Amino acid sequence: MSTEDEKLLKEAKKLPWDERLQHKNWKVRNDANIDLAALCDSITDPKDARLREFGPLFKKTVADSNAPVQEKALDALLAFQRAADADASRYAKEVCDAIVAKCLTGRPKTVEKAQAAFLLWVELEAAEVFLESMEKAVKNKVAKAVVPAIDVMFQALSEFGAKVVPPKKILKMLPELFDHPDQNVRASSKGLTLELCRWIGKEPVKAILFEKMRDTMKKELEAELANVSGIAKPTRKIRSEQEKELEEEVVPEAAGTNNSEEAVPEAPMEIDEYDLVDPVDILTPLEKSGFWDGVKATKWSERRDAVAELTKLASTKKIAPGDFHEICRTLKKLITDVNLAVSVEATQAIGNLAKGLRTHFSGNSRVLLPVLLEKLKEKKPTMTEALSQTLQAMHKSGCITLLDVIEDVRVAVKNKVPLVRSLTLNWVAFCIETSNKATVLKLHKEYVPICMECLNDGTPEVRDASFSVLTAIAKMVGMKPLERSLEKLDDVRKKKLSDMIGSASDTTSGTVAASNTGVGTSAREVMDSSSMRRSAASMLSGKKPVQAVPATKKSGPAKSATAKKTDGGPQSKASAAPVIEDVEPSEMSLEEIEEKLSSVVKSETISQLKSTVWKERLEAISMLKQEVESLTELDKSAELLVRLLCAVPGWSEKNVQVQQQVIEVSTYIASTVNRFPKRCVVLCLLGISERVADIKTRGHAMKCLTAFCEAVGPGFVFERLYKIMKEHKNPKVLSEGILWMVSAVEDFGISNLKLKDTIDFCKDIGLQSSAAATRNATIKLIGVLHKFVGPDIKGFLSDVKPALLSTLDAEYEKNPFEGTASAPKRTVRAADAVSSASSGTSDGLPREDISAKITPTLLKNLGSPDWKLRLESIDAVSKIVEEAHKRIQPTGTVELFTALRARLYDSNKNLVMATLSTIGGLASAMGPAVEKSSKGILADVLKCLGDNKKHMRECTLTALDLWVAAAQLDKMVPYITVTLGDQKTGSEGRKDLFDWLSKHASNMSDPSEALPLLKPSASSLMDKSSEVRKAAESFMNEILKICGQDVVAKNLKDLPSPTLAIVAERLKLSTVHEGFSDSVKMVTTSMSLPSKAGSKNNKHGPNDRGSNVSKAVSQRGIPARSSVTMISSQDSIQSQALFNIKDSNKEERERRVLVRKFKFEEPRREQIDELKIELFRHFREDVSLRLWNSDFKRQIDGIELLQKALPSSRKEVIELLDILLRWFVLRFCESNTTCLLKVLDFLPELFDVLKDQSYMLTEAEAAIFLPCLMEKSGHNIEKVREKMGELIKQMVNIYSLPKLLPYILEGLRSKNNRTRIECVDIIGYFMDHHGTEVSGLLKNLPSVAALTAERDGEIRKAALNTLATAYKNLGDDVWRYVGKLSDAQRSMLDDRFKWKAREMDKRREGRPGDARAALRRSVRENGSDIAEQSGEAVSRSMAGSMISRENFGYSDAHMVPRQMATATPGPADWREALDIVALGLPEQSVEGMKVICHELTQAVDPESSVLDDLIKEADRLVSCLAVMVPKTFNFSLSGASSRSCKYVLNTLMQTFQIKRLAHAVKEGTLDNLITELLLWLLDERVPLMDDGSQLLKALNVLMLKILDNAERTSSFVVLINLLRPLDPSRWPSPTPPESLAVKNQKFSDLVVKCLIKLTKVLQSTIYEVDLDRILQSIHIYLQELGMEEIRRRAGADDKPLRMVKTVLHELVKLRGTAIKGHLSMVPIDAEPQPIILAYIDLNLQTLAAARMLTPSGTMGQTHWGDAGSNNPNPSTHSTDAQLKQELAAVFKKIGDKQTCTIGLYELYRITQLYPKVDIFAQLQNASEAFRTYIRDGLAQVEKNAAAGRTPSSLPLSTPPPIAPIPSPKFAPSPVHTKSINNKTDCNEDDAGGDTHPFRGQGEIDNRLQTTNLQTDRYQSSGTLDALRERMKSIQAAAVGANFDGVQARPLPSMNGNTLHGGTRLDADPQTQNIIPPMDERALSGLQARMERLKSGSMEPL
């Protein structure tokens, strides 16, 4: 720079900024901009005043005409923007306009800086200004200026997101840009559109832009949109957000938390398309269209067209608001138009208006809604669909909310048309699902009652819709709002609702999980992609940018340094994610390279490499090669050496020899080093690829490329070569490069390649090349790929020209698929090379994710009622698979398979075939993963083989071929096995399946795959179709080849013998013949015996199934034996037993029977074969031969043999009853009447034997016999019918009537009219003889009444007779049970009932229904007698005896006699119901319990006064129900329904839920009830009953409710009483002696659990219980045991004893010494002493020791008061306070009439021992009457003591006056006690019922044993001396029991279930609060205080 310039610049610096920046000299302006930039960079405060000064300057500086100055001005602007804050945005408009005008056409660097400035303006919150400037920029005529403008909008949107950069303005700009003449502008606009799709979604962009776009552009964009995935996330924030984030990050950074980058990504922003479009005025064009005239036209078509015009205009996205009231009034009329088309059009118009106007349409929507809801009654699908869509649109658009339309909905759901009700509720469900949680929380209170009411609707659709609404509410806000309402639902509806809610929540959770995953991934993608600055055009496919070099340059050194550190130091096993290698080489000058290589390569060598003389260069490269080969640590210098070779001589070297040497050195380095950097490959690859094109260097270059592949993997090398070869101008580079790729694939295989990229490269570049050499090389490459990949590669090349396809096919033949056999010849050294592989599939071909294409619309259309739509959807699925090149991922296909499964059952067979083809294509495209995704659809595919159309079966087999190619045959075997055994498959289907299996059997190399198919195949050898037998035999031979004879024989041994014989014969299995058992030989013999007779008889008896089997089997080659041999041995056979039950496994046989199957089905062939085997196995041979003979006479002989043996073989007959019944069924199915009559003679005798044995048929036996008996009861011979009818009537003796009824009802559905008549008659018989209510016959009357409409007169007559019988029993009540009848039927019935009444009157039988009413009246009048009589009757009719149980173990004082039927005042219904329950009949009592439950429900109402009346009856009710518990359970166990059990438990539950009723239950009743409940809880038969698990649960819950609400004192007393061993007679069933002890133990465990529950809450309920009664019950329990038994049990760890001690311990702990005041019911002066007293004293001592309260003297002292009597000490005041409290407690006892005697006695003792103590000083505030009472009482006690009488037997004649002590200060406060006592949980172990006693309790036991307490050592305890002696003895024992140990031992802590050892006392201050406060601290009661007073340490009060 010249001196003048320097001087000028120096002078200019003195000028103001504006002058400097506008100076005429460009250097001055340039210098000023530089200074300004530096100054702005130095400013740290955004509010600096200088920034305001600089802001206006930039509008001129950035428009400088000098390019360098302009660039510096932009630098200054950027510095200013970085320093300023959002206030600077005021300058944005002028500056942006200037930049748009001058900077966008400048140098590339200038453009880049201008774009950066724009982005900073956006950051400074001037996005609107920025977009306004862009609107001007894109209108620039110069395309060069438009592209940067589009790019900067793209970058702004990409970085800041749609929230900061409004998309609306950008969308307005785009249509013009799509038609721009410049292709770069069009490409950039496409990229910007794609970015918009990422932010606001594809659909809004399509809707707004596509209509304004040319078709070609549309097509291009459609293709690009397919690549847009994921959801965008902003990567940059505006300035204010940055500042806020900085403030928020200060605290986390200080605390050392994670960076903000690791925060959870925000949810993607949702942008409404509605906000993006401009409103359109439709009112003006509507006026012009003639709408108003059209809607008034008389022609319906004109009205429709007028409304259609409105619909069309309103279909715009956003409608401008206006006055639409008149339009809506018109539409309201048109909705109800008589013409459906007009009505539909009007409805659609309303929907469009709602969508376009949104909230502006809310008022009109409210007016229209009632009409729309009313119109839902229209049944036409078009109308219904239009209404549904309109209603949904009104809600979604916000026109109406459910809160606003409650009344409209309420009216609609009461509409008389069910369709209106159901569709309204469906709409409500939709609205709730699309509302937010806050809205639903507001409205649920209104809608839940509506839904609950609709659940009782008579129409199923309405109920289902109501369930949907409740499900939607629960899904949105949880179950809590529904809980109250759900209590009113029955169990079935509750279960249905919970199932619906569960399935809905599962679906929701699955969807949420999936969506979350997607968001996470996309966010990560966005972060990765936004790290580089991109152009808009880079969004287009094929133009995606390479990794940005600037970014990698920065991170390069850091990453390499990290890598070096990692290599040097030891790596941990659980290392972090591997560091991604930087593959882009950074720039490095030759000087740097020389400097770094100075220690490795000589400087002369490098100098010579630079020489211009080729010989010197050749010599230098040779020297370099030697030096490199001599290096020992080549790894460190590898990259530098490669860089050196690339620089000198470089790849532009012209000399071939030098070139070859350079390539050789590179090859050596690549193949020698341990880790060859990918950067080196990138540096060399372009040069090497060019050398491949040269024939002189080709060999060396190819070898070098191969070495690169070994070093870094072929995937990386191929990926880099694609781009080089594609863009290179020399065609040889492409052709020869592809040829090298051929050799590379052969060497390395395909495991490291991205096959999709390779195939795309071949298809798009290689095959499209104009050079033949390139095309041929590409064909070779594809051929080699085929060798590794297989035929699947063809799917990716299907769109190639036909000529090329034929050439490719020829190449495929040269390179056949080798699969796993084609192992690679070379291996890759790099560990991370495998990561380049595209997918984890075995063939390496990529699979496409098609889940996005499986749209809800597609799935919906698959189930459309329109068959064309269904077919289109199936074809669409096939098209999706084709587009994915028949390679798909299983993601998202589960729902697709579910939808396709439904189409396999389509009524349109063509659709089924199309579905089969599609399923096959899906399986083939998905590969092995189809097995998991298809959800068992294969079973449904195989069912299509049952179709009789051959074409259908062929389609199925084709689908199976494709399936087996995808998933192995072994995965299909389970489905095929089921299909082969299914008779519905049909013979043709089974034959085709066997042929198919034979074809594919060769693929089963593993024998275990074929074994499951053996048995169904063997069974098919006996199929009636010869084609099936032939195909099965062929397949069996294939299995034989695969598995071998031994394996087949071993797996067939358990087949039925006839089948086994056939298999052995057909397959020539010698091993099977050898392995035949004797029974099989016997069967073959028996089958061959009657062959001749069978063939003769067959002409006369074609229905003899047994003979058919015998004949068929014998004809198939089973060797026959001579009948003579068999007959000659008959004498020896006769001596054998008739039955063989040794190996009978009846349970196993019954398990195979399908129970609960009431309909009769003909016996199948395999069932007959199985019966034959069982018959020969378990019956004597001669009997079996007779029974299984084709001659009916022989069969009759067999029956006679059974008849004779019946009386003596009852046990055996019962064991084999199921076999006999199956044989009888076979006889019923035959036409031989003689044999049938013989069977019918034998069966009554058999049933009589069963009845005598009290045997009841099992479910399986009934399922075998009864369906056939009912079906055949309509026999065409009258005599047979009569016998069968008698047999059915006899069945009730061995099978309960309720269980028999379903079979009879099934008979009513028979196709045989005679059967139906017989079944109706039988129902009538049972009604007449067993009553209508006993067995639930009333439920079946509707079925009988329905038969009165039959054509057949006999059926009508029978039905009328049966109903007349019902009328006789029920009277007019019968009409309640007959169901809905037509008028004609009612008239017919009415006539018959009148006739019946007349007949009854003639016979003097009274009026219909009188007997029933009389029974009820007699129940009320003398319930006890009737109860007794009916109870006896029922007990006789039941199989299980009902054992009455007695109360025991209660003293007379507390036993309450039970009076069953005493009439007490109460509601009439209640008393009548109680009388019915008292009868004791389980079935009838249900009706009574219903009434009781209803009354109890009413009683809960707080306004009701019923409860007071019911309380008087509570004890009687519970007493009756307690008696009903065993009766109902025994009744249910005898085979009846468990209904009555449920009602009893439910009634008890409702009773005990009301606390006042529970408290009114007396102790004796409670004892009986608890005993019954616990016994049934333990009964092992209960779980086996119907609903057994529910009953057990109900018993448990009921017990808990009783413990919660019953009177607690009674509960304690009852449970302690039940701890004694239970009387054996009280168990529900006879108990073996050896198990009685075990049962008692279990019973005690349950009682203990109940006591634990009561004891746990004792601290809070201590003031609710009568402690005197509880202590009395404990006393009785301990006294009954005795001291010796207590010691023995303590050693045996007896739970009941421990529990009693625990209860006592808790009571002592909670009440302290005051517990002694509750011994009024314990004879404390009895001789010997009660055991409980010793336990109380020792508990007090233990608790005091735990609290560390020790006597005032030394440990050796035996009482309290000997030490320090005259020494005043701090404890004196506390002692005074204790004495005051003790006296207060005594006075309190005296004030209570229950304890006044004991109180006076204690007070008397104090006065006798310590006469100086003035007890009346405490009574200054008491009344004179109370003081007088005490004086008189003391005198009376003194008198009694002199006479030697105990106080417990001497109650005072006068009760004490009330409230002797008004001040509460001396009495312990219950509130205070609760607050200061630490809350302790009782020890409990729920699992085993085990109780761990308190630790202190164990110490008491030990002390009692060490003290060797002998109660008889004391003299009379009636004297004070005796009491004193006893107290001293106990204290001495306590002192001798090591108090140190007591103090040191930790106190236990309870945690609810298990007792754990506690902490030391000094460690846990809370445990020290267990002992009550001062008033209850003394250790040995009154004695301690007496001693203290005596010693004079306390002054008299």
UniProtKB/Swiss-Prot annotation:
Its annotated compartments are: Cytoplasm, Cytoskeleton
Q: Which Pfam families match?
A: CLASP_N (PF12348), XMAP215_CLASP_TOG (PF21041)
UniProt GO BP: establishment or maintenance of microtubule cytoskeleton polarity; microtubule polymerization; mitotic spindle organization
Bias (Basic and acidic residues) ranges: 1400-1410
* HEAT repeats: from-to residues: 48-86, 164-202, 321-359, 362-400, 441-479, 848-886, 890-928, 931-969, 1007-1045, 1233-1259, 1260-1294, 1295-1332, 1334-1372, 1539-1579
Listed InterPro entries: ARM-like, ARM-type_fold, CLASP_N_dom, HEAT_type_2, TOG, XMAP215, XMAP215_CLASP_TOG
Q: Where is this region: Disordered?
A: 236-264, 501-576, 1087-1115, 1400-1436, 1755-1776
PROSITE patterns referenced in this protein's UniProt entry, alphabetically: HEAT_REPEAT
Q: Which GO terms describe its cellular component?
A: cytoplasm; kinetochore; microtubule; spindle pole
Q: Where is the composition biased (Low complexity)?
A: 529-539
GO molecular function annotation: microtubule binding; microtubule plus end polymerase; microtubule plus-end binding
| Entry keywords, A to Z | Cytoplasm, Cytoskeleton, Microtubule, Repeat
Regions of compositional bias (Polar residues) in chain numbering: 504-520, 1764-1776
Which family does the UniProt entry place this protein in? Answer: Belongs to the TOG/XMAP215 family.
Q: What does this protein do?
A: Microtubule-associated protein that is essential for cortical microtubules organization and function.
Entry protein name: Protein MOR1
